[in-house]
């Protein structure tokens, strides 16, 4: 039994809680620095030549589950451990402290009052009147008072004692919500062209929701850099009701039936071109990260040089489209919707560049618990600021003295500044 109590004491200790918080904060920082949720090959390729911190390569990142920190077993273990520690601490320390704070403490000897942090002695002629005036003054100032014929016990701000347990309770809710989201949450990221749609299928095979991209627009700064992405989406849930149309943008997601739909990214997915008298051709574009973060392109056959190819690259929907020989020499540039240029002996025209919107769809059943936990933690933190004050007054008939004293769990100097007012009331009797 002693071993069990030692284990419980250790689990609920402040040192362990601080250590766990440190490791959780460190893990969260790692999850910020290392991209989360990418393909395994991306980690292996990106960290092959340049390991993270000079030590951790892609294989080690995958082995340590650093590619999905917040749903990794060790991170969930830390959250569970902290939650258990908080529950044990609340049960063994916070709850008994709260119960003790709710009990009235009755001092019936002057020596007890003299030992308090703040204490005074006042000579009074009419003890009954002094006790009554002090009682009325405390009541009017919001104190909870218990009075007897020759003594008073009063307290104020007891609600502040509920703060620490509420903070613990809120943090436990937060961790339960975070764990539930990590275990049961799902996310889907999809690039859609205007007119295209995505069907979200429930586990039982029933089509729950259809999301269709009606329009996509990129707002750019004068220097051509993207400033904002706007997607007009249409949602239908299979019912007979009219589809719902909404607009989403970066930092302005859409919440619908427990899902959160984000405007996450953008891309160039295709290009419409015409070669000579050919019909309009739609060619797919692929990202070329070797040439830059936002560069897309396609390889075209070089009709003038058998076995060789021409590289078309483009970085925005407004162009220009750049053409390079296989040796890397620039051939020409064509603006979408602009003039034709001769390439491979053919008049070549770039008619239009097709954009696609990066839609991120998240389902996180733990979000309500996280919000509730945050609200409880915030309320508990605010309540904890309230200082709990206690005051006692005792009249001794044999020497005609009224002893008055008090204590406070915080802001004792502020409480001491209130004492002259109480003494003035007593002396006026």
Curated annotation (Swiss-Prot):
It holds the Pfam family ResB. It comes from the Bacteria. One of its GO terms (cellular component) is plasma membrane-derived thylakoid membrane. Disulfide bonds: none annotated. May interact with CcsA. Required during biogenesis of c-type cytochromes (cytochrome c6 and cytochrome f) at the step of heme attachment. This is Cytochrome c biogenesis protein CcsB. It comes from Prochlorococcus marinus (strain MIT 9211). The lineage of its organism: Bacteria, Bacillati, Cyanobacteriota, Cyanophyceae, Synechococcales.
């Amino acid at each position: 039994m002693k071993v069990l109590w030692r284990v419980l004491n250790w689990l609920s200790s402040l040192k362990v809680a601080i250590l766990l918080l440190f490791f959780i904060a460190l893990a969260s920082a790692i999850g910020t620095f290392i991209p989360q949720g990418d393909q395994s090959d991306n980690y292996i390729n990106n960290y092959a030549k340049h390991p993270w911190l000079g030590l951790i390569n892609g294989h080690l990142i995958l082995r340590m589950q650093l590619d999905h920190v917040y749903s990794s077993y060790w991170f969930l273990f830390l959250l569970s451990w902290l939650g258990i520690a908080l529950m044990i601490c609340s049960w063994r320390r916070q709850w008994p402290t709260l119960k003790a704070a709710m009990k009235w403490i009755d001092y019936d000897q002057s020596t007890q009052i003299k030992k308090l942090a703040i204490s005074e002695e006042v000579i009074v002629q009419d003890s009954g009147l002094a006790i009554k005036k002090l009682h009325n003054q405390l009541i009017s100032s919001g104190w909870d008072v218990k009075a007897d014929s020759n003594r008073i016990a009063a307290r104020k701000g007891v609600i502040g004692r509920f703060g620490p347990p509420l903070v613990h309770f809120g943090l436990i809710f937060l961790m339960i919500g975070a764990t539930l989201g990590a275990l049961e949450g799902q996310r889907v990221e999809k690039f859609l062209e205007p007119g295209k749609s995505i069907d979200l299928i429930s586990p039982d095979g029933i089509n729950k929701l259809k999301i269709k991209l009606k329009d996509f627009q990129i707002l750019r700064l004068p220097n051509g850099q993207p400033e904002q992405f706007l997607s007009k989406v249409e949602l239908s849930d299979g019912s007979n009701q009219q589809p719902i149309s909404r607009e989403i943008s970066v930092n302005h997601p859409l919440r619908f039936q427990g899902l959160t739909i984000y405007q996450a990214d953008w891309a160039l997915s295709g290009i419409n071109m015409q070669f000579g008298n050919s019909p309009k051709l739609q060619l797919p574009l692929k990202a070329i990260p070797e040439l830059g973060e936002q560069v897309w392109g396609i390889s075209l056959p070089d009709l003038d040089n058998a076995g060789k190819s021409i590289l078309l690259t483009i970085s925005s929907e407004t162009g220009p489209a750049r053409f390079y020989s296989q040796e890397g020499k620039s051939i020409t540039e064509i603006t979408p919707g602009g003039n034709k240029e001769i390439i491979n002996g053919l008049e070549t025209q770039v008619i239009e560049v097709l954009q696609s919107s990066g839609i991120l769809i998240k389902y996180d059943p733990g979000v309500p618990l996280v919000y509730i936990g945050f609200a409880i933690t915030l309320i508990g933190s605010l309540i904890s600021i309230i200082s709990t004050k206690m005051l006692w007054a005792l009249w001794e008939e044999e020497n005609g003295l009224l002893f008055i004293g008090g204590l406070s769990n915080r802001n004792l100097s502020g409480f001491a500044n209130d004492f002259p007012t109480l003494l003035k009331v007593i002396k006026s009797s």
